[in-house]
Each structure stands twice: as C-alpha cells, then as structure tokens.
C-alpha cells in the first residue's frame, strides 16, 4: 500500500476493481490543510481516462506488476516501441505514456521501465532525471539578475519548461521527469 502522495506517473493502481495507469500527478498544499493529489488516470482494460482527486494520506493499492528495463527504439504511430537487453520488442500505446512522451527522443540512451499487465505492455516509467538539449529559448534579459529569474524553453522531444535565465539554445540541461522541472545545466 502506498499513500497518494507516493504515487508517481507510470505506477499502476487498483481503483474500483480495475487497474489504472497513473499518467500525471499534481500535488497542491494549502496553509493548514493536508496535501491534495490530483491524478490523471487511464483504465488499462477499458481504454478510458479520468481525472480524480485524493487526499495526500489516502492509501491505495499499487499493483506490483512485471517490469523490464528497456530502451526506446522507435515510434510507429500510435505505438512507441521499446527493446529489452535480449532484443525483444514491446509496443506501448502513445496514450499510455501521458506526459512522458514529451521526453522520449530518437537515440535516447536512458533506460526506462516498461510495465506489463497480463502480458501486455501498458506503461513506461522514465528515469527520475534525464538530460535533453534546449531547442529554443529566448535570449537572456540584460540587467534582470535579482532573485531566481526563469524563462520558458523547449527541449528536444517537445517538452516546455521553465529554465534559469542563463540557459541558452543548444545547452544540455537536466530535467526531473516527475515534476517536469529544470534541475541544472550539464
């Protein structure tokens, strides 16, 4: 059993007797109130999606499924194809990846975990941090150096995030895949 706060994208939870892939989580905290976790879920069996809200301390069944370390091979619309160390290929529907699809690029070297339910590849969990190239960002604003200055940037794969003001187009940056936040320039 995990608390709602411990669940992250790529996990599979049992809800109302059906397995659901967690595609996105967003935790909000307010003054004296407990944390609230919003989750975007996709039903593995019915191919339907929903958004639901839990209290941070709510307990839920995190289904322990077979997981394999795989690397990304290619995209064959609408499937992402991953390969394990023994060269077996597994198709994962694009809809099951959620926000992770914005970080998947051709030639990526990071090892992902592909999750299986009843022999079918149902989700992919990215490593906690990945390194991507900034494909576009505005030039730094001169003289704007007070505090932590952030600006929008697009990275290879298509994800958009806020980066530090000193980051330029072409720089390699480290991204936390759980939150989609800029960590550092590499």
From Swiss-Prot:
Entry-linked NCBIfam families: efp, PRK00529.1
Pathway: Protein biosynthesis; polypeptide chain elongation
Protein name: Elongation factor P
Protein keywords: Cytoplasm, Elongation factor, Protein biosynthesis
SUPFAM superfamilies, per database record: Nucleic acid-binding proteins (SSF50249), Translation proteins SH3-like domain (SSF50104)
UniProt xrefs under PANTHER family: ELONGATION FACTOR P, ELONGATION FACTOR P (EF-P) FAMILY PROTEIN
InterPro entries xref list: Elong-fact-P_C, NA-bd_OB-fold, Rib_uL2_dom2, Transl_elong_fac_P/YeiP, Transl_elong_KOW-like, Transl_elong_P/YeiP_cen, Transl_elongation_fac_P, Translation_prot_SH3-like_sf
Lineage: Bacteria, Pseudomonadati, Pseudomonadota, Gammaproteobacteria, Alteromonadales
Domain of life: Bacteria
GO biological process, one term: peptide biosynthetic process
Gene: efp
CDD domains reported for this sequence: S1_EF-P_repeat_1, S1_EF-P_repeat_2
TM segment ranges: none
One GO cellular component term noted in the UniProt record for this chain: cytoplasm
Function: Involved in peptide bond synthesis. Stimulates efficient translation and peptide-bond synthesis on native or reconstituted 70S ribosomes in vitro. Probably functions indirectly by altering the affinity of the ribosome for aminoacyl-tRNA, thus increasing their reactivity as acceptors for peptidyl transferase.
Compartment(s): Cytoplasm
GO molecular function: translation elongation factor activity
SMART domains in the cross-refs: EFP, Elong-fact-P_C
UniProt record similarity statement: Belongs to the elongation factor P family.
